[in-house]
Amino acid sequence: MNQKKIFFDTNVLIYAHDRSSTFHTDSASLLKLVFSRQIKGIIAEQNIIELYRVLTNSVAMKGKSLTPLQATDLIAKTYRSGIFNIVYPDSSTIDKVMELAVSKSIVSAKIFDTRLAALILGTDTDYFATYNVKHFKEIEGLNPLTPPQILATLS
């Protein structure tokens, strides 16, 4: 069987660790498929930084934030242990970001989603797991689906 390659958005990673989220179960299920090697997980270095920011923010984590050491440990063990492919930008990524920014009239903080999209477009990916499908559906070449949609496709 051909292992599906899933690129993860940061929101899915966060929900996988936030048991209070209504999105936790499906996000955690998708993450478990990576650890059981049923799918290949792909993330960007940007996801790691964004994940750290949220995990250490008490407002975002509803009073249950992690210390810097706890967040760094979780990230090291979960995402930097070799299970996930981590994608890094290069000069062609920046070119693609600028191209998309102009063609899609991207402004302000939306540039960060555009940067992630550019990284995904440069990666061999079957699906992009996100709960922000609407932010990405207009970008040709991406296949953004929610974790429940991906889980249904895989079953």
Briefly describe each language-model feature range.
Residues V54-V87:
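Helix-adjacent hinge/juxtasegments
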Residues K77-T93, M98, S105, F136-S155:
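Short acidic, glycine/proline-enriched helix-loop-strand junctions
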Residues M1-K5, T114-S155:
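Acidic, PIN/NYN-like endoribonuclease modules and their adjacent C-terminal/linker elements
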Residues I42-E45, T130:
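Short beta-strand segments at enzyme active-site cores
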Residues M1-I43, A60-Q70, E138, L151, ...:
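Short, well-structured N-terminal submotif of metal-dependent ribonuclease cores
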Residues N11-V12, Q46, R115, K134:
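Alpha-helix/helix-capping structural signal
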Residues N2, F84-Y127, Y131:
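Active-site neighborhoods of divalent-metal-dependent phosphate/nucleic-acid chemistry enzymes
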